[in-house]
């Protein structure tokens, strides 16, 4: 249904693809993977005819509708969340809008002489609107918006009041309501919580069209895709199966290619040695010439291009006291809304707590209380003896200084550290080479998050409070962060929508419920078994 055949594309001197082919047919769910900047979003823009290929052919099945979700959602205002979702839902919303115009036209006495033509057109549009499920559109829109985390009261409020992340959800709802023949989803999980991600998984698994998706959420890809297409170094390679299977296949292919390379190098060395030894002897001239021709015809096997995965050995944090954080009798309100009433919590040294709860349950509020970013209305929240706190929150990124580069930011924080050490730190967090000269004001959200985490972990605290630390991080950076934190000798309290991250790092779970706190002695994997759900609010 969607095909790229022998496509080449470059941005300036940088070659993204060379003679690359890719296909997605109805019923296929394709995960598009590769390092940042490899050209994943460019593939979507080529399919949508927003960019042109330098060579080859991009084709979409005739009359097929394509829904494209990108991170650029545009302006939203002047209508309710529900109206904004419906108005951008493609052909069905266009048909609904035309029906309303036709109804007004037919009721206009000044257009009585056009009534027959208007009635005929109304019948055609109404039939198409019905065929597209238009009469159930509002009900479907409410269902999709609820699945994406919108409370009923918010659905009928002004979309202009929403934050950027919630507007992203509205944009995603629009695309899902289109019921297109093909879906292109570029990082759809970036602004979703676990409950919404799980709902989206169910929705996409039942989608019957062609799906091409990018995501840094490993678990999400594993549950959805039937094929992985990797873009790396100008090459586009397809693998059957989910993300885990792709990694296994890729590793096996690399091992086989390395073995073939080694065998060929040994053979070439042997042949070259023979030629060098006998090239001056007339009695061996025919054999030497034969072997020279043989070498000329051999297609040289290259070593596989391995992605540079940079590791960084973080220092051991100072030891804290055994009691790291204590909340006693804590009450917290926002206006008339009570978030906590008489809450008690003790966090002890080297425990790794992840906090679960539906939207609005107070996960971020709990982390702010523990970190001292806000005060309780009643009760106490105190840190224990010798606790050195590291608090990562989304607003942390606003504290970077405009005009300073990545390297200067690290140097300002650690003036006595060597240049080599700081550049190694920057590279480990996704700023290799000249990227350290990027100024803070031009960094993306993900780059800012990586820089804040680099600053925090270089001189590590012994108590990490992390509010969505993996937002916008690519898989390689997440893997590096997980490996670093697996060996972290301190205490952790975290909120994350990344289930792979939670599984790897947590050993205690705190669930916020309307009836108070529920605690689980095992990590996230044990919580799923014990609670019977992957997240609160999921049956």
PLM regions: where:
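ABC ATP-binding cassette signature C-motif
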Residues: 1-261, 308, 314-539
């Amino acid at each position: 249904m969607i095909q790229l055949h022998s496509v080449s594309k470059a941005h300036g001197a940088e070659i993204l693809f060379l003679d690359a082919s890719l296909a997605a047919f109805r019923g296929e769910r394709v995960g598009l993977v590769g390092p940042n900047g490899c050209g994943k979003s460019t593939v979507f823009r080529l399919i949508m005819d927003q960019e042109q290929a330098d060579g080859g052919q991009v084709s979409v099945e005739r009359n097929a509708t394509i829904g494209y979700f990108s991170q650029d959602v545009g302006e939203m205002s002047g209508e309710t969340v529900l109206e904004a979702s419906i108005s951008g839902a493609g052909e069905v919303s266009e048909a609904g809008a035309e029906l309303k115009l036709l109804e007004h036209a037919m009721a206009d006495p000044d257009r009585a002489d056009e009534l027959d033509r208007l009635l005929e057109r109304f019948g055609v549009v109404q039939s198409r609107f019905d065929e597209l499920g238009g009469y159930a559109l509002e009900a479907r829109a409410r269902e999709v918006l609820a699945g994406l985390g919108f409370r009923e009261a918010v659905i009928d409020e002004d979309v202009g009041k929403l934050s950027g992340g919630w507007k992203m959800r509205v944009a995603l709802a629009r695309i899902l309501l289109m019921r297109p023949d093909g879906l292109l989803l570029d990082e759809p999980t970036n602004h979703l919580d676990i409950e919404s991600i799980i709902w989206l998984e169910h929705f996409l698994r039942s989608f019957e069209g062609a799906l091409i998706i990018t995501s840094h959420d490993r678990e999400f890809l594993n549950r959805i895709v039937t094929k992985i297409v990797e873009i790396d170094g100008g090459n586009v390679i397809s693998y059957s199966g989910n993300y885990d299977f792709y990694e296994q296949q890729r590793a096996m292919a690399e091992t086989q290619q390395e073995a073939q390379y080694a065998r060929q190098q040994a053979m070439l060395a042997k042949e070259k040695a023979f030629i060098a030894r006998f090239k001056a002897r007339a009695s061996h001239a025919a054999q030497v010439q034969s072997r020279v021709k043989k070498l000329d015809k051999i297609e040289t096997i290259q070593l596989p291009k391995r992605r540079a995965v940079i590791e960084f050995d973080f220092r051991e944090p100072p030891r804290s006291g055994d009691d790291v954080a204590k909340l006693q009798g804590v009450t917290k309100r926002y206006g008339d809304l009570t978030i906590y009433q008489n809450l008690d919590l003790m966090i002890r040294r080297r425990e790794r707590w992840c906090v679960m709860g539906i939207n609005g349950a107070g996960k971020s509020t709990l982390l702010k209380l523990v970190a001292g970013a806000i005060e309780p209305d009643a009760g106490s929240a105190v840190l224990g003896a010798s606790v050195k706190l590291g608090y990562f929150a989304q607003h942390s990124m606003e504290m970077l200084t405009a005009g300073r580069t990545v390297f200067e930011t690290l140097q300002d924080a650690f003036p006595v550290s060597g240049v080599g050490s700081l550049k190694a730190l920057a590279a480990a967090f996704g700023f290799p080479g000249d990227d350290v000269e990027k100024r803070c004001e031009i960094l993306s959200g993900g780059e800012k998050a990586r820089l804040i985490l680099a600053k925090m972990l270089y001189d590590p605290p012994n108590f990490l409070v992390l509010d969505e630390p993996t937002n916008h991080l690519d898989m390689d950076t997440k893997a590096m962060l997980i490996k670093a934190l697996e060996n972290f000798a301190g205490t952790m309290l975290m909120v994350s929508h990344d289930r792979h991250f939670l599984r790897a790092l947590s050993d205690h779970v705190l669930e916020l419920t309307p009836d108070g706190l529920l605690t689980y002695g095992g990590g996230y994997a044990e919580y799923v078994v014990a609670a019977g759900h992957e997240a609160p609010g999921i049956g």
